[in-house]
Design a protein with these regions (language model features):
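N-terminal non-catalytic accessory region
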Residues: 1-146, 150-206, 311-315, 324-483
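Secretory/organelle targeting and membrane-embedding segments
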Residues: 165-343, 347-360
Length: 483
């Protein structure tokens, strides 16, 4: 079936990427500022000057298309697959991508790039202006918004605060928080440890980005405002908005207060039919215990993880309370928009499978599963430790001890800047073994290939509870910088 064919062009689709998912460039020189890793590696002495242009505000920066060419590591925030895979999937399904003149009988898809640094109010307003231009091109047809992460936030702002409910018929929100992510506070407090690839750390890339992020109004708008996720060592709730001395400057604290105000203004109203696709069963930062020093200053935070999320956004925040349809998948925040199971559901919904009543699809409801590797980056030849925990949660939680788990390392793509790299001849495969001391926990190890690149660590889980389940975790193989 070709989903993009339509007897009438009664709507068009807009892809709204998430945080850091749009390219940014200098308006005057047209130089890509975010992010051209090959260019940075060719001229590392220029990295600091290039990145400084990202400091907000800087009106000489403009969006220049969506991230559509390579995987982006921004740890500990997320491992982001590129949106080109989503666009190509829709093209293969018969949709028309970014047409100058729409073809009758074809449903058009428009990727929307925006400056993700700026206040999400402004991004939502600009999205509205562009959607209305596209409506004119389509004789008044309404938009269907497919939005990932922060893209869902600006989509909701457009719909609820900029009159967009007259322009939008459906919203499809993928891993998009309505009540932020604790990881935003973790990044603001501790910074990034890897951005792009490890080699860039030699030039202070991660530290520079960590400094710049504190100047972005939008990042403070990703902080949870309803869920009290922080406590002191005395188990007292810690209000990070009232006690804002964890931030270094008065400007940072003003941005924090405006982030709170933004979310209070946006609220939880949904004026158009909304579908939530969300990830679960991934180790996700959901809470933190803060050690306080003199004057209530934060000394350190012990972050707590559970499987109730996609690795970045807690499940509670990714499931909008007013959404009519909700679909859960065992996926990461950074690949929810390209995962095969999610795309199958999206195809169904875009083909007209939407219901008017509340509809919920939940996978793994009777299976507690956690699959992970011990690191995100490995050197060639290094041992990759893999584990998976399985529990039957009906009627009560019991470890599953008779499962079979087959794990393989599947080539995904070269590291940024190494586009000529080719996949290894035979990636490793193993079967995980039951841990004799931990019922329900399966462990194993394999050797990272000598070929640098990005790989999917893929596990096929065989249990008696349901049909075979495939889960993945993305890792990178890269030599130690300077080694």
């Amino acid at each position: 079936m070709v989903f993009g064919d339509s007897s009438s062009s009664d709507h068009f689709i807009v892809i709204v990427p998430g945080y850091m998912g749009s390219l940014l460039r200098d308006k005057n020189t047209k130089e890509t500022i975010w992010i051209d890793i090959p260019a940075m590696l060719r001229n590392p002495a220029h990295i600091d000057d290039t990145l400084e242009k990202l400091r907000y505000p800087n009106e000489d920066i403009e969006p220049a298309g969506i991230m559509d060419k390579s995987v982006l590591y921004v740890l500990p925030w997320a491992k982001l697959d590129h949106y080109g895979r989503l666009i190509e999937h829709l093209r293969e399904e018969g949709f028309e991508i970014n047409p100058e003149t729409p073809t009758p009988g074809k449903t058009a898809v428009y990727p929307y790039a925006y400056d993700w640094r700026q206040d999400n109010r402004l991004s939502g307003r600009q999205l509205g202006e562009t959607v209305r231009d596209w409506r004119q091109k389509h004789n008044g047809a309404k938009a269907w918004l497919v939005a990932h992460s922060n893209g869902g936030i600006i989509s909701r702002w457009f719909v609820e605060k900029e009159g967009g409910k007259e322009d939008v018929e459906h919203m499809f929100l993928m891993g998009s928080p309505w009540d932020g992510s604790p990881k935003s506070v973790r990044v603001l407090f501790e910074g990034y440890n890897i951005v792009g690839r490890r080699l860039l750390n030699l030039f202070g890339f991660n530290k520079k980005i960590s400094s710049l992020i504190r100047s972005f109004p939008s990042f403070y708008q990703l902080i949870p405002y309803q869920n009290p996720f922080l406590r002191t060592e005395d188990n007292e709730v810690l209000d990070l908005f009232t006690n804002a001395n964890w931030l270094e400057s008065e400007q940072d604290r003003q941005l924090l207060q405006d982030g709170l105000k933004f979310n209070q203004e946006l609220g939880t109203t949904l004026s158009v039919h909304t579908v939530c696709y969300f990830g679960r069963k991934k180790p996700t930062t959901t809470a933190g215990v803060v050690s306080l020093g003199v004057g209530g200053k934060w000394k350190e935070v012990r972050w707590l993880e559970t499987g109730a999320g996609d690795g970045t956004i807690p499940e509670r925040s990714a499931v909008h309370p007013q959404a009519k349809e909700r679909h859960a998948f065992a996926v990461d925040h950074g690949n929810i928009y390209v995962h095969e199971d999610v795309l199958t559901q999206l195809d169904f919904d875009l083909a007209g499978g939407l219901g008017g009543l509340e509809f919920v699809t939940v996978t793994l409801d009777n299976l507690s599963l956690e699959f992970d590797a011990n690191e995100d980056f490995y050197t060639p030849g290094e041992t990759v430790q893999v584990y998976c925990t399985l529990k039957d949660t009906t009627p009560e939680t019991n470890p599953i001890t008779d499962a079979r788990l087959e794990v393989s390392l599947v080539w995904k793509e070269p590291l940024p800047g190494d586009e000529d790299a080719s996949p290894p001849v035979q990636p490793p495969e193993i079967s995980l073994k039951q841990d004799a001391n931990e019922p329900g926990t399966y462990r194993g190890s394999l050797t990272a290939p000598m070929q640098e690149g990005t790989y999917n660590l893929r596990a096929v889980v065989h249990t008696n509870l349901q049909s075979d389940l495939t889960v993945e975790e993305m890792i990178a193989v890269e030599a130690e910088p300077g080694g």
